[in-house]
């Protein structure tokens, strides 16, 4: 069991909506995928210094002796079993990679072996495990990362807080313009007043870029991220994601 979740077996689709009252485990379910990414990135030891087994195990160590996770995608799967040391930190009792239900098992690890493995099976798994990120666009206050300028070269992927949104969109504009046009079309379906992005390096500092955009009826007036409502800028980030 993990936190408030004793056991769950759930088939996930490309888009999934979790509905439930407060405290039923929606946030904990999502945070499990962050834990999987932490394990893959070999940061389990540091993570459990702040998050001991007593906090992560369902009703603590007295009730739960180990935490198990199993993720299946097509012919491949990944499994991990975590157990607690006497000091409350966690170690990997078993880590398993599967192909067509046939596992390779490695036991008693401080950190995951998958990231450094050279086998073809584990290389394929890495593409999944390293992609497990939790994107959180809740902070839309003035001066929030989502509304701030970004380093124009910080564009390899969209960050989990959206802090490099203008740089990532600019990269799409320059390298994948059709993708950017689809994003703009999606935004207009929810925000009819939205015209287009006006993305370019700052004339005063070419290493920086702001989220500039034009209005459908007046493309000469200056608008940036601070002119968007909280819901609008969150939707732009989600459409980009």
Spans of features found by a protein language model:
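Pre-Walker A adenine-sensing motif
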Residues: 2-9
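Electropositive, glycine-dotted interaction segments
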Residues: 68, 72-199
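Short, mixed charged/polar active-site loops
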Residues: 7, 75-79, 220-222
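Conserved functional loop/turn residues at catalytic and ligand-binding sites
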Residues: 1, 14, 22, 227, ...
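Phosphate-binding glycine-rich loops of NTP-binding sites
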Residues: 14-51, 95-97, 161, 235-241
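Conserved P-loop NTP-binding catalytic core
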Residues: 30-90
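Conserved ABC ATPase signature
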Residues: 185-241
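Conserved RecA-like P-loop NTPase ATPase core
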Residues: 1, 36, 80, 228, ...
């Amino acid at each position: 069991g993990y936190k408030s979740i004793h056991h769950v077996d759930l088939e996930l689709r490309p888009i999934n909506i979790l509905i439930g009252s407060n405290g039923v485990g929606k946030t904990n379910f999502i945070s499990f995928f962050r834990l999987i990414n932490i394990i893959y990135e070999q940061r389990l030891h540091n993570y459990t210094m702040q998050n001991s087994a007593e906090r992560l195990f369902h009703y603590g160590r007295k009730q739960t002796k180990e935490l198990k996770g199993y993720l299946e995608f097509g012919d491949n799967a990944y499994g991990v079993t975590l157990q607690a040391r006497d000091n409350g930190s966690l170690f990997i009792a078993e880590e398993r990679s599967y192909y067509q239900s046939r596992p390779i098992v490695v036991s008693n690890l401080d950190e995951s072996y998958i990231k450094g493995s050279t086998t073809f099976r584990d290389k394929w798994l890495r593409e999944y495990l390293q992609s497990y990120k939790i994107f959180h666009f809740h902070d839309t206050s003035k001066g929030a990362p989502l509304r701030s300028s970004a380093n124009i070269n910080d564009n390899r992927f969209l960050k989990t807080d959206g802090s490099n949104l203008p740089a990532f969109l600019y990269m799409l504009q320059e390298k994948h313009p059709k993708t950017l046009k689809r994003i703009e079309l999606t935004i207009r379906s929810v925000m009819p007043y939205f015209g287009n992005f006006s993305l370019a390096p700052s004339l005063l500092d070419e290493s920086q870029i702001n989220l500039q955009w034009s209005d459908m009826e007046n493309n000469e007036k200056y608008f940036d991220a601070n002119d968007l409502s909280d819901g609008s800028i969150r939707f732009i980030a989600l459409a980009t994601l």
